[in-house]
């Protein structure tokens, strides 16, 4: 016992507070409990999270995984001392990816690295993760909080995670079924989402003069740049799952880093191209402000940001209205922005 106490004291002297870790776990348990579903087989604290697979009715169940983080959006959360929504971003970046395959999220695990474990802050972060899990129907079955003194400043942290989903093999989206004349539907984004923040910090000189982002901005309808930037990434899982049950979806793209030019082609087969009507895209004011302030060419903006479109979905032209009705009923701002055309050169054209 004396040896253990001595070891703990030495660990604390090195900057790792074990007691804070225990307290953080206790504070986050209420958040985690919100995410429990029928697949959960154990409580928080075990060495591994156990989850029963819901494979009834599936011929060939396939697990689909995705991992991601929030990029330097975390820096904004730290600067604003607002940590209760950044976890939504971490979940969104993963579950929005796996839904592009047609997979329903089952569970999520998070990883937080921090300079100093402040239990209340960690609980806020995990509270956001839990909210993202609730929005996507995933269970938060585990995670890790690692205290890294000497490696990270005390106030800093990073957040990442991974999601696992399931889909029947025959229902995995197959882009080779896409055809000329199919329609491209846009799902509106909630804002910047979770990429391009290093450029944003440079454009608005946030690191040198952070006070500017807290002033109300006319271009943003009176909102501050800060609150606009920190708006959580929209989670599309439940609306897209409803769509998949009723419409012959040919392809889905999650518009993240690389914008339209990098992400839309990922769901387009060779020989076809998504022809996007630039005038149809509902560009959010924050993107116009970034472009104007940073003197950034429009193509570069569409090659970096979602520009107001968080996801694109390709459906047969004959099913467009059905798709729009379903998506609207589930709270999405959905509209047609283009069509699929033949092309052996480019896979996406904006004009």
Task: Describe the role of every protein-language-model region.
Residues 2-38:
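N-terminal amphipathic/basic leader segments beginning at the initiator methionine
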């Amino acid at each position: 016992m004396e040896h253990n106490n001595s070891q703990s004291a030495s660990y604390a002297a090195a900057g790792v507070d074990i007691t804070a870790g225990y307290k953080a776990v206790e504070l986050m348990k209420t958040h985690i409990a919100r995410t429990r579903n029928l697949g959960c087989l154990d409580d928080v604290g075990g060495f591994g999270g156990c989850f029963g697979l819901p494979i009834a009715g599936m011929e060939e169940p396939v697990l689909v995984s995705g991992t991601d983080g929030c990029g330097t959006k975390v820096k904004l959360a730290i600067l604003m001392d607002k940590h209760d929504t950044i976890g939504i971003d971490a979940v969104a970046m993963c579950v929005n990816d796996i839904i592009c395959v047609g997979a329903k999220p089952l569970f999520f695990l998070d990883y937080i690295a921090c300079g100093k474990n402040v239990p209340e802050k960690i609980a806020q972060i995990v509270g956001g993760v839990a909210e993202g899990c609730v929005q996507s129907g995933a269970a938060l079955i585990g995670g890790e909080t690692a205290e890294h003194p000497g490696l990270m400043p005390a106030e800093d942290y990073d957040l990442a995670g991974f999601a696992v989903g399931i889909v029947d093999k025959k229902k995995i989206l197959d882009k080779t079924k896409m055809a000329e004349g199919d329609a491209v539907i846009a799902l509106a984004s909630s804002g910047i989402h979770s990429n391009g923040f290093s450029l944003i910090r440079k454009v608005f000189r946030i690191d040198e003069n952070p006070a500017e982002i807290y002033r109300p901005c006319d271009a943003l309808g009176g909102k501050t740049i800060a609150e606009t930037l920190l708006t959580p990434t929209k989670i599309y899982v439940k609306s897209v799952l409803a769509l998949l049950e009723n419409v012959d979806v040919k392809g889905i793209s999650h518009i993240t880093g690389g914008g339209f030019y990098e992400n839309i082609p990922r769901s387009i087969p060779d020989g076809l191209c998504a022809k996007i009507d630039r005038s149809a895209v509902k560009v959010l004011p924050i993107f116009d402000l970034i472009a104007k302030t940073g003197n950034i060419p429009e193509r570069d903006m569409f090659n970096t940001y979602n520009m107001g479109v968080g996801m694109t979905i390709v459906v047969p032209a004959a099913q467009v209205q059905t798709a729009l009705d379903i998506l609207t009923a589930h709270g999405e701002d959905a509209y047609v922005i283009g069509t699929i055309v033949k092309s052996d050169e480019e896979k996406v054209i904006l004009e």
